[in-house]
Amino acid sequence: LIMGHMVNAIYQIDEFVNLGANSIEIDVSFDDSANPEYTYHGIPCDCRRWCTKWEYFNGFLKALRKATTPGDSKYHEKLVLVVFDLKTNSLYNYQAYDAGKKLAENLLQHYWNNGNNGGRAYIVLSIPNLAHYKLITGFKETLKNKGHPELMEKVGHDFSGNDNLDQVAKAYKKAGVTGHVWQSDGITNCIASFIRGIDRAKKAVANRDSSNGFINKVYYWTVDKYSTTREALDAGVDGIMTNYPDVIANVLNESAYKTKFRLATYADNPWETFKN
């Protein structure tokens, strides 16, 4: 996946997909009552990016639904997966369940159209804090209570805090998650990637490829340079999050990579570990 980073204004959906992204990441900020309120990142954010673009969350969901509903005038066939970067650090731990409940209610109504020919993209709920694992429980139980447990087939999970992978596994156990796991690793583009290195991403890939690992897919962020793109592909990641989708697309076209990698389509299962 080429994952467009920080797509928080509606017009940016077209912009990033047209540059080559088949996935986008959206920041979701919450109000004091744990309602998802805006698609908004805020300051500070990645270097060479405008941090303060925003929409109302439900307005963005409606636009996203159009972009991922076949037959709609705004439809993008290649946009297959959406990561919601949930900014839950503004909430108390005890609010995590409510945040999940309200997120599910909003998505059900405005994105999935109450289960009636809604948007088709796969969704990854990315949570920054392991202590907020009950967000997953709240989300899952709400879809079940509303009569749409089948929509969980479209939902995957990520803990984005760069935590120790053993701790991540424990949080999933508490949340009752046994699949659909994307593991993120990375750092803001303001810090050169070689300072932090790619070791943790390699550990995540090793977990993914082991017989008893809990990870299905690994993505690395935020990659804007040709050299870092090659390094991430060499490590065997499944997705690269970027501010410049065209850079990643160009590298994937290089002779060293174009026989080994291809862009995911809707026919690919994002929860299934790719076996060489």
From Swiss-Prot:
The places in or outside the cell where this protein is found are:
Secreted
Provide the E.C. number(s) assigned to this enzyme.
Answer: 4.6.1.-
Task: State the Pfam families in the record.
Answer: GDPD_2
Q: Name one GO cellular component term.
A: extracellular region
What is one process in the GO biological process aspect for this record? lipid catabolic process
- Identify which cofactors the protein needs according to its UniProt entry: Mg(2+)
What terms describe the molecular function in GO for this protein? lyase activity; metal ion binding; phosphoric diester hydrolase activity; toxin activity
| Gene3D superfamilies assigned to the protein according to its UniProt record, in alphabetical order | Phosphatidylinositol (PI) phosphodiesterase (3.20.20.190)
Protein known as: Dermonecrotic toxin LdSicTox-alphaIB2
Q: Identify which residues the record assigns to the active site.
A: 5, 41
Q: Which UniProt keywords apply?
A: Cytolysis, Dermonecrotic toxin, Disulfide bond, Glycoprotein, Hemolysis, Lipid degradation, Lipid metabolism, Lyase, Magnesium, Metal-binding, Secreted, Toxin
- Species name: Loxosceles deserta
By sequence similarity, the record places it as follows: Belongs to the arthropod phospholipase D family. Class II subfamily.
Subcellular location, principal: secreted
User: Quick one: which residues bind Mg(2+)?
Assistant: 25, 27, 85
Asked whether the keyword Membrane is assigned, the reply is: no
What EC class does the entry list? Answer: lyase
- Please give the function described in this protein's UniProt entry: Dermonecrotic toxins cleave the phosphodiester linkage between the phosphate and headgroup of certain phospholipids (sphingolipid and lysolipid substrates), forming an alcohol (often choline) and a cyclic phosphate. This toxin acts on sphingomyelin (SM). It may also act on ceramide phosphoethanolamine (CPE), lysophosphatidylcholine (LPC) and lysophosphatidylethanolamine (LPE), but not on lysophosphatidylserine (LPS), and lysophosphatidylglycerol (LPG). It acts by transphosphatidylation, releasing exclusively cyclic phosphate products as second products.
Keyword set includes Secreted:
yes
Q: In which tissues is it expressed?
A: Expressed by the venom gland.
Q: How is the cofactor bound?
A: Binds 1 Mg(2+) ion per subunit.
Q: Which reaction does it catalyse?
A: an N-(acyl)-sphingosylphosphocholine = an N-(acyl)-sphingosyl-1,3-cyclic phosphate + choline; an N-(acyl)-sphingosylphosphoethanolamine = an N-(acyl)-sphingosyl-1,3-cyclic phosphate + ethanolamine; a 1-acyl-sn-glycero-3-phosphocholine = a 1-acyl-sn-glycero-2,3-cyclic phosphate + choline; a 1-acyl-sn-glycero-3-phosphoethanolamine = a 1-acyl-sn-glycero-2,3-cyclic phosphate + ethanolamine
